[in-house]
Amino acid sequence: MTFSGHTARKRFGQHWLINERVLDRIVEAAELQDGDRVLEVGPGRGALTERLLASAAAAIHAVELDRDLVAGLQQTFASHPKFSLQEGDVLSVPLELSGGVPANKVVANIPYNITGPLLDRLIGRLDRPVDFSYQRLVLLVQHEVAQRIRARPGHSNFSALSVRMQLLGRCSHVCPVPPRCFQPPPKVQSEVICIDPFPPERRPTAALSRGVERLLKMAFLSRRKMLRNTLAPVGSTDLLQSLAEEAGISLQQRPQDVAPEAWVALAKGLNQVDSVA
């Protein structure tokens, strides 16, 4: 490698993943096959890049913000026929491979302070879908965020984020990543997760998505209160009871007990009422 003298920069949130087993698990989770085109976010010093290039994937397109690292990556991998590199902010630069061809899988060891915005760009939001759906994303994120993304109804970590993400794709745990797996070690625990985004036809419609967002904002504002209280602005008690029965839930439940699909059903009933009113 040609990164001698380069130290991790705090302003970029840099922590190099150095644990070989975790690096291998990330590549395994991506299930790379012949023809796959991979977008690697934050290649850093290239430890994961090297493994991706050795996989069956057809192309690896890396996006790196740190100019010094870009120079090292170019020097190390530029001669590899499967490698291409884009310098810039992953939140704003084009993410397509050369020739405008989109990647179909994403592998990312991202600065934790851009996790939310990056997920918005790669997967979209309920109320703002993306035009293109990746087949799989393997992401190294802060453990606390991972817990919220994949938490199931009834768990203390189940939140509005859980509902949103699980309506956008299938979210699963890959492996824990303790601080000692990085150089320098971060102050928080980390986790590798896998997200398989749903195609557009499996996602809630735009109208339903707006309804779900409206309900989530009301309900999780006071997550410990029962739905009969948090959803009171929706309408009368009788209306709420009717909508809840149609959605298969109880107004005695708390927001964290309601499954993502039930929020969609509740939004559908509410939209029907609004269209008649």
Curated annotation (Swiss-Prot):
- The reply on keyword S-adenosyl-L-methionine is yes
Task: Quote the catalytic activity from the record.
Answer: adenosine(1518)/adenosine(1519) in 16S rRNA + 4 S-adenosyl-L-methionine = N(6)-dimethyladenosine(1518)/N(6)-dimethyladenosine(1519) in 16S rRNA + 4 S-adenosyl-L-homocysteine + 4 H(+)
Q: Where found, per UniProt?
A: Cytoplasm
- Positions in coiled-coil regions: none
Judging by the UniProt lineage, the source's domain of life is Bacteria
Please provide, alphabetically and separated by semicolons, the GO molecular function terms listed in this UniProt record.
Answer: 16S rRNA (adenine(1518)-N(6)/adenine(1519)-N(6))-dimethyltransferase activity; RNA binding
Q: Mind telling me which InterPro entries this protein's record contains?
A: KsgA/Erm, rRNA_Ade_diMease-like_C, rRNA_Ade_Mease_Trfase_CS, rRNA_Ade_methylase_Trfase_N, rRNA_adenine_dimethylase, SAM-dependent_MTases_sf
Which Pfam families does the record match to this protein? RrnaAD
E.C. code:
2.1.1.182
Give the residues the record marks as binding S-adenosyl-L-methionine.
H15, L17, G42, E64, D89, N109
Instruction: Name the UniProt key words of this record, in alphabetical order.
Output: Cytoplasm, Methyltransferase, RNA-binding, rRNA processing, S-adenosyl-L-methionine, Transferase
Principal cellular location given in the protein's record = cytoplasm
Name a GO CC annotation attached to this entry.
cytosol
The record lists its disulfide bonds as: none
Q: Please list which residues make up the signal peptide.
A: none
What is the enzyme's class at the highest EC level? transferase
UniProt family annotation:
Belongs to the class I-like SAM-binding methyltransferase superfamily. rRNA adenine N(6)-methyltransferase family. RsmA subfamily.
Function recorded in the entry: Specifically dimethylates two adjacent adenosines (A1518 and A1519) in the loop of a conserved hairpin near the 3'-end of 16S rRNA in the 30S particle. May play a critical role in biogenesis of 30S subunits.
UniProt name for this protein: Ribosomal RNA small subunit methyltransferase A
* Species the sequence originates in: Synechococcus sp. (strain CC9311)
Specify the taxonomic lineage: Bacteria, Bacillati, Cyanobacteriota, Cyanophyceae, Synechococcales
